[in-house]
């Protein structure tokens, strides 16, 4: 008969003194570190190209060279743009300043926050402002790079309709332009379902925007005049970083 007092030795998993305990601690630490590395990699790669946005409905566009405030990841200069895709002044602004803003983004001088608002929609224009703005958010969900191309295309002379015109791009055309910008994915369903129509409807009021284009630099409204003046203003904030001297780019044709 076995002696009830003779029990098999127990392995104390909590004890750091035993060899097995030390192995468990080392293994657990390694797993935690590995998980952290994988998580950081996922966050960085997901944020890099997938849709993104900033706050209050803005689509944030940056580059990996972004000049940040010391000790933080916050940009030194944020240019906020509030635009309506049907607005003729917005078209003029983008064709005149768009290449320079894009260049400032690429050299890391600014983060650009694009808020596409609906001010000019009406049944007469098939609610184009709202549909185009909502489509831009659909594209941004899939790719920020594609959003940049889509945004530029919709303000081009060949595509932007006249505010008093009789024909306006339908959803099929917006989907085609999104495809040409480099995305398909969920964009067609997003556009056709009107996923972001209610969102864009209230963006102008939420930001207290009454006219487009409105441009702000670090939250203060900026009276734009020339691309050179814009570059000079940004240079005051971030300094003379590489590429700044050639950032004022010729207007788009």
What are these regions (language model features)?
Residues 58-60, 127, 158-160, 183-184:
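A general structural signal for short secondary-structure boundary/capping elements
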Residues 54-55, 138, 190, 223:
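Functionally engaged cysteine thiol sites
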Residues 39-41, 66-72, 110, 168-176:
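Short low-complexity stretches enriched in small and charged residues
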Residues 46-108, 114-116, 124, 242-253:
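Extracytoplasmic low-complexity, Pro/Thr/Ser/Ala/Gly-rich segments
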């Amino acid at each position: 008969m076995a002696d009830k007092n003779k029990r098999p030795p127990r392995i104390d998993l909590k004890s750091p003194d035993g060899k097995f305990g030390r192995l468990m601690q080392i293994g657990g630490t390694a797993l935690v570190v590995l998980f952290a590395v994988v998580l950081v990699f996922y966050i960085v790669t997901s944020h890099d190209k997938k849709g993104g946005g900033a706050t209050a409905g803005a689509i944030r566009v940056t580059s990996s060279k972004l000049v940040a405030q010391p000790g933080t990841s916050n940009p030194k200069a944020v240019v906020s743009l509030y635009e309506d895709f049907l607005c003729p002044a917005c078209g003029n602004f983008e064709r005149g300043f768009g290449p320079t803003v894009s260049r400032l983004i690429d050299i890391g001088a600014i983060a650009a926050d694009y808020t596409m608002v609906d001010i000019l929609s009406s049944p007469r224009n098939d609610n184009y402002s709202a549909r185009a703005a909502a489509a831009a958010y659909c594209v941004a969900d899939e790719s920020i790079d594609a959003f940049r191309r889509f945004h530029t295309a919709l303000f081009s002379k060949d595509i932007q309709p006249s505010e008093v015109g009789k024909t306006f791009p339908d959803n099929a055309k917006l989907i085609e332009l999104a495809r040409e910008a480099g995305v398909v994915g969920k964009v067609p369903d997003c556009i056709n379902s009107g996923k972001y129509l209610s969102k864009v409807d209230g963006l102008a009021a939420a930001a207290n925007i009454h006219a487009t284009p409105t441009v702000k630099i670090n939250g203060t409204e900026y009276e734009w005049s020339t691309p050179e003046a814009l570059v000079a203003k940004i240079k005051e904030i971030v300094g003379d970083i590489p590429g700044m001297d050639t950032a004022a780019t010729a207007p788009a044709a």
